[in-house]
Swiss-Prot record:
Location (main, coarse): membrane
Biotechnology: Soapwort saponins possess anticancer properties and are also being explored as enhancers for endosomal escape in targeted tumor therapies. They may also serve as precursors for vaccine adjuvants.
S-S pairs: none
Name of protein: Beta-amyrin 28-monooxygenase CYP716A379
Pfam families in UniProt: p450
Binding site for heme: 444
Entry's Gene Ontology molecular function annotations: beta-amyrin 28-monooxygenase activity; heme binding; iron ion binding; monooxygenase activity
Organism: Saponaria officinalis
Length: 502
């Protein structure tokens, strides 16, 4: 018995000693005699990933950053600290100057980096990383997501989708709707119509199936890379495969329709991908143009669905929340939107010029994105050693920038918790401080797409309804995008009814 007790004590001592050694070694503050930013690396393999996720689960993703800036950067909101995230040695940077450094030095000091779960969710037959895939996709963006003439084509489509979604009665009037869920459904309708010309009312089975898998994918796409049957990551990978397989079949059908003249090359992003070579005949070694195959088209359309859906749905959902909490802002938007409506004939669809008149509405939407940005931040990878604020950022380390480090910085946005659309009037906030879409050459190419969709929706919702929050203090969870814990239940009141009640 004494021998067993002694051996047990020695085993515990060995484990504690070994763990202490690993922690001390793993948290070494220097590299080749050069000073790394202060911080802590957490435990081997895990690092501080759990703390990173837990801050979002508590609805305060910014606390992970601000708490460590307070401890390791003496409260400097433009500082930095080292940590370990997603199994990688990382440095978290904060402030507009850091944003400018990263956004302005793509391929010079840094390159884009995605967690392993992203590479798995968006596979390429050419064995490209998610970063390389993103660069390839930018070949297609100008013709469909950036140029004004392309964007103008979307507005009537978005308007028509919005009117038809309202006609389903999903928005009320009602004593209770779960606004977050209805918003998710609406924005997926629009994405399927714009990117693949799939009409949710004409082909509800396809859209519903894609949407079910899509929600599973979103729940695990940014989770820890642990592929076991019960993990969110495992379920997300299965959902990714299901969506990509479905899109491949849609692409095969569209290819036949293009050959028969039943579809046209500029119809939507799907047709454009099928008809546009990624390598011209002149640049090809065999003198033949190279096109995307169906599998890679499935991956790229999936990426568009994620990007085109999540930003808009998140912004619209929290627009409801902040308008309910700030009725004076809602009334100012209502006045502006009624002025636009007064210029339209009955049934006439919105156009580009109409949306340009919605200036205050867009200021309010920007304030929504400041307080609840759809994207919390992103990673870069250092491709060479360089310094920032006097500290070494070593080659190969990951660098994380966060929207919250500037969006909630009181030195940039006084009273940062206050909802105030006037912050965006005139010249707006300083450069590199408002970054819901990132910045530099890696700025989200869907920024204008999201702007058009959200403004189109705002026009219809405020001219038809007022609303009240049923749970004013509902908890907000961020994982990885913000969402209300109880799906934002609202009482929807028709404008005519609200006038009668008044």
């Amino acid at each position: 018995m004494e021998l067993i007790t002694l051996l047990s004590a020695l085993l515990v001592l060995a484990i504690v000693s070994l763990s202490t050694f690993f922690v001390l070694y793993y948290n070494t503050p220097t590299k080749d005699g050069k000073t790394l930013p202060p911080g802590r690396m957490g435990w081997p393999f895990i690092g501080e990933s759990y703390d990173f996720f837990a801050a979002g689960w508590k609805g305060k993703p910014e606390s992970f950053i601000f708490d460590r800036l307070k401890k390791f950067a003496k409260g400097n909101l433009n500082g930095q600290f080292r940590t370990s995230l997603f199994g990688n040695k990382s440095i978290v940077v904060a402030g507009a100057a850091a944003n400018k450094l990263l956004f302005s030095n793509e391929k010079k000091l840094v390159t884009m980096w995605w967690p392993p779960s992203i590479d798995k969710a968006f596979p390429s037959t050419a064995q490209l990383s998610a970063n390389e895939e993103a660069l390839l996709m930018r070949k297609f963006f100008p013709s469909f997501l950036i140029r004004r003439e392309a964007l103008q084509r979307y507005i009537p489509i978005m308007d028509d989708c919005t009117r038809r979604h309202f006609a389903t009665g999903a928005w009320g009037p009602s004593d209770k709707i779960e606004a977050f869920n209805v918003t998710q459904d609406y924005t997926f309708w629009v994405a399927c119509r714009v990117f693949m010309s799939i009409d949710a009312q004409e082909d509800p089975e396809t859209v519903d199936s894609l949407f079910r898998h899509f929600n599973v994918l979103k729940a695990g796409i940014y989770s820890m890379h642990i592929d076991l049957p019960w993990t969110n990551f495992h379920h997300a990978m299965k959902a990714s495969h299901a969506i990509r397989s479905a899109v491949e079949q849609i692409a095969k059908k569209r290819r036949a329709e293009l050959a028969e003249g039943k579809a046209f090359p500029t119809q939507d992003m799907l047709s454009y991908m099928l008809e546009t070579p990624i390598t011209s005949a002149e640049d090809s070694k065999d003198g033949k143009a190279k096109y995307l195959n169906d599998a890679d088209i499935g991956t790229k359309i999936l990426g568009l669905l994620v990007g085109g859906h999540d930003t808009s749905s998140t912004v619209i959902a929290f627009f409801f929340k902040f308008m309910a909490e700030n009725p004076h802002v809602y009334e100012a938007i209502y006045k502006e939107q009624m002025e636009v409506a007064a210029t339209k004939a009955p049934g006439e669809l919105l156009n580009w010029d109409d949306l340009q008149k919605m200036k205050y509405s867009w200021c309010a939407i920007c304030e929504v994105m400041r307080l609840t940005p759809p994207v919390q931040g992103a990673f870069r990878q250092a491709i060479t050693d360089f310094t920032h604020n006097g500290y070494l950022i070593p080659k190969g380390w990951k660098i994380y920038w966060s929207t919250h480090s500037t969006h909630r910085n009181p030195e940039i946005f006084p009273q940062p918790e206050k909802f105030d659309p006037t912050r965006f009037e005139g010249n707006g906030p300083p450069a590199f401080s408002f970054v819901p879409f990132g910045g530099g050459p890696r700025m989200c190419p869907g920024k204008e797409y999201a702007r058009l969709q959200v403004l189109t929706f705002v026009h219809h919702i405020v001219t038809k309804f007022k609303w009240e929050q049923i749970l004013p203090n509902e908890k907000i969870i961020v994982s990885p995008m913000p969402y209300p814990e109880k799906n934002l239940p609202l009482r929807m009141i028709a404008r005519s009814e609200s006038a009668t009640l008044a």
